[in-house]
Regions:
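Accessory, non-catalytic peripheral segments of nucleic-acid enzymes
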Residues: 8, 48, 285-424
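A conserved active-site cap/scaffold subdomain adjacent to cofactor or substrate pockets
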Residues: 233-299
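Conserved beta-strand elements of the Class I
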Residues: 15, 140-142, 279-281
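N-terminal active-site segment of His-dependent metallophosphoesterases
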Residues: 1-79, 86, 202, 407, ...
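Divalent metal-coordination and catalytic microenvironments
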Residues: 19, 39, 59, 74, ...
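A short helix->loop->beta-strand "cap" motif at the edges of active sites that frequently abuts
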Residues: 83-89, 198, 258
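Short, conserved loop/helix-junction motifs that constitute active-site signature segments
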Residues: 83-85, 234-239, 255, 321-324, ...
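His/Asp/Glu-rich metal-coordinating catalytic cores
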Residues: 66, 97-257
């Protein structure tokens, strides 16, 4: 049953969500059923709560080349929400999305009052949206997608780190400043004509300084080389009444500001997020002041993390089997015994049940192998950065040389992850 939040009379109601990552797998396991249930729930939440504006702040898909099934879920949802009470849908691209893929059907979607902003445009009006209801303006939206390096910096070569950080910050700040100035002028013009001050809402897909990452395995990627967490909240003009952010998967206020928010991902993207509430945000504007409430998203697939010795793991699994649980589990063995057949033992124990062990880590055996064979590494447990760190260690690279090499490597990674393969 979808919860219903009381809506003030004459208020403009906005629903803020982000980071769906449609098509994302968890240790190879498809999650389409979960995504489908979430999107069905979201349509119900929109209708039950009389939502006027839906904002999706980036990372609609998990990859730039989404599967046919992921695309089907996306377009089915848009078809459903177009028939709902929601008057306006605004979707901006995140760093996982292909800007050209999202933008491709925008002309058709415009006819359904669905505005898609996949990439930065030279035309300021493409990112500055004026929303109307009954032929009267009701809100201004500064709809900014993820700003790629080429959008905000003239140079993309291997500059020194400080110059790159400075140029990145200045590029982002300039982009928001330009849009904010136009939005404020538009707001004033509307006030003079209609004698009503309407709210200014901005979107962003970036990492603002002081924000807290939900976990190390939630699928987030570094956005800007060397500047992770260094984009200050001060880039948002004080005239902006609400900032709808995406990228970070934990719902939170930014810099203790009630009006600058990450809504977080609606589903746990990794076992590190187990037990953390997932939500979308409801924002009511009776004038230009936002009143923010959260709406909890149900858990559509139970995820469980079990860590400890064999006795603890065995007891926990037996309890799940006893309760006929339908759960996906991650098991981390940290006992004193080596237990080389741990994976086989667990698979046999769970055979025929609805408990699925997606990831089994034998930390004890792994550490023993590391002690006896330092070069034996489990790539499954290493990030791209960890692999490069191991290479630097193997080559005995000095501490003085490492920052420049890491900077170059991160630049290459960023280019790989943000290159739009559909762009001509």
């Amino acid at each position: 049953m979808t919860a219903t939040l009381k809506k003030p009379t004459h208020a403009l109601r906005v629903l803020h969500t982000s980071d769906w990552h449609l098509g994302k797998r968890l240790y190879g396991q498809q999650r389409y059923d979960e995504f489908s249930e979430f999107l069905d729930w979201l349509v119900d939440a929109i209708n039950h709560n009389d939502v006027d504006v839906l904002i999706v702040a980036g990372d609609v898909f998990d990859t730039m080349t989404p599967s046919n099934r992921a695309q089907e879920l996306y377009y089915r949802f848009l078809g459903q929400v177009a028939k709902s009470c929601c008057r306006h849908v605004i979707i901006t691209a995140g760093n996982h999305d292909s800007p050209t893929f999202l933008d491709a059907p925008k002309s058709i979607l415009n006819a359904l009052n669905i505005k898609v902003i996949g990439m930065v445009s030279h035309d300021i009006d493409d990112e500055l949206l004026l929303l109307h209801h009954q032929n009267k303006p009701e809100a201004i939206v500064i709809a900014v997608p993820y700003l790629r390096d080429k959008d905000i910096r003239e140079s993309s070569n291997f500059d020194d780190l400080k110059s790159k950080e400075h140029d990145t910050f200045m590029g982002i700040a300039k982009h928001y400043d330009t849009l904010s100035e136009h939005a404020k002028k538009l707001q004033q013009d509307i006030f003079e004509k209609f004698h009503k001050k309407i709210p200014i809402i901005a979107t962003g897909h970036l990492f603002v300084a002081g924000s807290q990452i939900s976990s190390k395995d939630d699928g987030m990627r570094d956005l800007y080389v060397g500047t992770l967490g260094q984009i200050p909240s001060g880039i948002f003009d004080p005239a902006i009444d609400y900032v709808a952010l995406g990228h970070i998967h934990a719902s939170q206020k930014v810099a203790k500001c009630e009006h600058i928010r990450y809504c977080g991902s609606p589903m746990a993207m990794g076992f590190g997020e187990v037990g953390k509430d997932k939500q979308v945000l409801i924002i009511d504007f009776e004038d230009t002041s936002p009143a923010v409430q959260s709406l909890c998203v149900p858990v559509f697939q139970q995820l469980i993390q079990i860590s400890g010795d064999w006795q603890h793991i065995n007891d926990a699994l037996n309890e799940l089997l006893k309760n006929n649980a339908n759960a996906w589990v991650e098991i981390i063995y940290t006992g004193q015994e080596l237990r080389p057949h741990l994976t086989d033992d667990i698979r046999q124990q769970l055979a025929g049940s609805c408990v699925l062990a997606l990831n089994i880590q034998n930390r004890t055996l792994y550490q023993k192998s590391m002690d006896s064979q330092p070069k034996l590494l489990n790539l499954k447990q290493l990030s791209e950065t960890d692999v490069f760190e191991q290479l630097l260690n193997q080559k005995s690279i000095s501490e003085q040389e490492r920052p420049l090499l890491k900077n170059a490597y991160q630049t290459l990674l960023a280019n790989i992850h943000t290159h739009d393969h559909l762009e001509k």
